From Swiss-Prot:
Basic residues bias spans: 240-256
Reactions this protein catalyses: 5-amino-1-(5-phospho-D-ribosyl)imidazole-4-carboxylate + L-aspartate + ATP = (2S)-2-[5-amino-1-(5-phospho-beta-D-ribosyl)imidazole-4-carboxamido]succinate + ADP + phosphate + 2 H(+)
SUPFAM superfamilies: SAICAR synthase-like (SSF56104)
Region entry Disordered, spans: 234-256
Protein EC: 6.3.2.6
Keywords: ATP-binding, Ligase, Nucleotide-binding, Purine biosynthesis
Gene this chain is encoded by: purC
Sequence similarity: Belongs to the SAICAR synthetase family.
Taxonomy, superkingdom: Archaea
Membrane-spanning residues: none
Listed name of the protein: Phosphoribosylaminoimidazole-succinocarboxamide synthase
Gene Ontology MF: a single term: ATP binding
UniProt-listed GO biological process terms: 'de novo' IMP biosynthetic process; cobalamin biosynthetic process
Source lineage: Archaea, Methanobacteriati, Methanobacteriota, Stenosarchaea group, Methanomicrobia
Organism: Methanoregula boonei (strain DSM 21154 / JCM 14090 / 6A8)
PANTHER family in the record: MULTIFUNCTIONAL PROTEIN ADE2, SI:DKEY-6E2.2
C-alpha cells in the first residue's frame, strides 16, 4: 500500500489518501496539545506510543464485536484504516467525576458516576466544542435518532470492555472520548483510543496516567506514556487451571 496525498491534518494526527480505494493512512505525529491548542509541544516517540495503544484497543474491540476503522499497522506510528464519513460529534463516557464535569457541576473529583454518564459535544474548535443534547443533534442533522441510539449503545459496550481490560492492569478508566463515522449505513468507531483521549488513574496511587500529566505539569509525560503503553499492551496471562486435590490411599482402598 502506498501513501498518497495529504487529506487532513489535525492537532496530533495527519490523514493521507492511499492507492487502495476506501483505505486511508493515519499518521500519529509527535505533537501534543492542550487547552484548544493553547499549549503545545513536540515530544519524540509520542506518536508511536499512541498509535500502538490505539491499535491494541481497536484489535481488542474488534475481537469483541465492535466495528472499528482499524485495518493494520503500516509502521510504529502509521495505521491503515477504513475511509469513513465522520460524524462531527465527540462522545465522552464518564465513569468518575473529573475534568470539566467537576468545574461545571457540583461533583467532587473522583465521585463514581453510576450509571456512566454520556456527554456529547459538537466537534468544532471554533465554537470550543459545545455540548449538545439529542434534540439539537437531530435538528442539526448530525445523526438520526436511530444512529444516536446505536452510538450510545456502542459507547457503553466499549466502556464495559475497556474498563474490565484496564482493571486487570491496575488502571481505572475515569473517562474517555470516542468518535464515530459511517460507511454506508454502518456505524464504525474511528479516530483513536489512547492516553490523549482517555483519563486514566492508577488504582493504588491515584496517579494520573494520561495527558493530564502534560496538561497540568504533573511530571514527565513521555515517561508516563512509555510506562502506560507497556502496561496496557502487556500480554494477559491465561488463568491458571485449578489443580485437582490428590486422592488419598484410604479413598482409593474404599472405592475398590
Amino acid at each position: 500500500m502506498k501513501q498518497k496525498k495529504l487529506l487532513y491534518t489535525g492537532k496530533a494526527k495527519s490523514v493521507y489518501h492511499t492507492d487502495e480505494k476506501g483505505t486511508l493512512i493515519v499518521e500519529f505525529r509527535d505533537d501534543i496539545t492542550a487547552f484548544d491548542g493553547g499549549k503545545k509541544d513536540t515530544l519524540k516517540n509520542k506518536g508511536s506510543y499512541n498509535a500502538g495503544v490505539s491499535a491494541f484497543f481497536f484489535s481488542y474491540l474488534e475481537k469483541n464485536g465492535v466495528k472499528t476503522h482499524f485495518l493494520e499497522m503500516q509502521d510504529e506510528s502509521r495505521m491503515a484504516v477504513r475511509e469513513l464519513s465522520m460524524i462531527p460529534l465527540e462522545v465522552i463516557v464518564r465513569n468518575y467525576a473529573a475534568g470539566s464535569i467537576v468545574r461545571n457541576y457540583p461533583f467532587k473529583e473522583g465521585t463514581p458516576l453510576k450509571p456512566p454518564v454520556i456527554v456529547i459535544d459538537y466537534k468544532d474548535d471554533s465554537r470550543h466544542d459545545p455540548m449538545l443534547n439529542d434534540e439539537l443533534i437531530v435538528a442539526l442533522k448530525l445523526a438520526t435518532p436511530a444512529e444516536l441510539k446505536k452510538i450510545k449503545a456502542i459507547a457503553l459496550k466499549i466502556n464495559t470492555l475497556l474498563s474490565g481490560l484496564l482493571a486487570k492492569q491496575g488502571i481505572t478508566l475515569v473517562d474517555f472520548k470516542l468518535e464515530f463515522g459511517r460507511q454506508g449505513t454502518t456505524i464504525y468507531l474511528g479516530d483513536e483510543i489512547s492516553m490523549d483521549s482517555m483519563r486514566l488513574w492508577d488504582k493504588k496511587t491515584g496517579e494520573s496516567l494520561d495527558k493530564d500529566v502534560y496538561r497540568f505539569n504533573k511530571g514527565d509525560v513521555m515517561a508516563t506514556y512509555n510506562r502506560v503503553a507497556a502496561r496496557i499492551t502487556k500480554p494477559q496471562k491465561p488463568a491458571a487451571a485449578k489443580k485437582k486435590a490428590p486422592v488419598s490411599k484410604k479413598t482409593v482402598k474404599r472405592t475398590r
